[in-house]
UniProtKB/Swiss-Prot annotation:
This is Putative archaetidylserine decarboxylase proenzyme. Its main location: membrane. The modification Pyruvic acid (Ser) is found at residue 172. Is synthesized initially as an inactive proenzyme. Formation of the active enzyme involves a self-maturation process in which the active site pyruvoyl group is generated from an internal serine residue via an autocatalytic post-translational modification. Two non-identical subunits are generated from the proenzyme in this reaction, and the pyruvate is formed at the N-terminus of the alpha chain, which is derived from the carboxyl end of the proenzyme. Catalyzes the formation of archaetidylethanolamine (PtdEtn) from archaetidylserine (PtdSer). The keyword Cell membrane applies. Keywords: Cell membrane, Decarboxylase, Lipid biosynthesis, Lipid metabolism, Lyase, Membrane, Phospholipid biosynthesis, Phospholipid metabolism, Pyruvate, Zymogen.
Length: 208
């Protein structure tokens, strides 16, 4: 399955590749055109891999939160987990908890490497999900290559845990806040999968 919002990129890459392939064939394999066509085929293939959106069986529960993104935990501070998505990771983001989207805040910004401290000033999109345990903030932060954050959900939408809520094109980062009713269960440097990895569990003394 290909991620929603990736169609323009794939169509452009495939169209340009096809054009150069036709020109190369029409000119009896002119080396320069043949080279461009081969590079285009390789880039199109890489994009197909990058924009993949595999189906995942999500086990939902009120007793834990799941990762909103594929990638590696690069920081944990002030009850916020920061996940860096490398180019080879799936870049579709999912709701870490069930609830209602009360607000979506988009901010323009720069395009510094998403793992840098200064990336706090990068382009970003913040979902505020109102859950039974309070507000959970999921922040998509664009990276050095990314130029547009794609949003799948809208304000007042009710989302289920693990539901797709958006995507960031190319290298990027996702931050998620953890309510005080939960204990964080991941560590810095740990690899996580969106919709699969448990990142926090309900405290034992919490009454349902």
């Amino acid at each position: 399955m290909i991620a929603k919002g990736s169609e323009p990129w794939l169509f452009t890459a495939a169209s340009v590749t096809a054009l150069f392939a036709i020109l190369s064939r029409a000119t009896d394999g002119l080396p320069f055109l043949n080279y461009i066509a081969n590079v285009g085929m390789a880039l199109t293939f890489v994009m197909v891999i990058f924009f993949r959106d595999p189906e995942r069986k999500v086990e939902t529960s009120d007793t834990y939160m799941i990762s909103p993104a594929d990638g590696t935990v690069i920081d944990i501070r002030d009850r916020k987990i920061c996940i860096f998505m490398f180019l080879q990771n799936v870049h579709v983001n999912r709701a870490p908890i069930s609830g209602k989207i009360s607000e979506i805040i988009y901010k323009k910004g720069g395009y510094l490497p998403a793992f840098c401290k200064d990336s706090e000033r990068n382009e970003r999109n913040e979902f505020i999900i109102h859950s039974k345990y309070g507000d959970v903030r999921v922040t998509q932060i664009a990276g050095i290559i990314a130029r547009r954050i794609v949003t799948y959900s809208n304000v007042n939408d009710t989302v289920e845990q693990g539901q797709r809520i958006g995507m960031i094109r190319f290298g990027s980062r996702v931050d998620v806040t953890i309510p005080h009713d939960f204990d964080i269960t991941v560590e810095k440097g740990e690899r996580v999968l969106a919709g699969k990895t448990i990142i926090a569990t309900i405290k034992n003394d919490r009454d349902f």
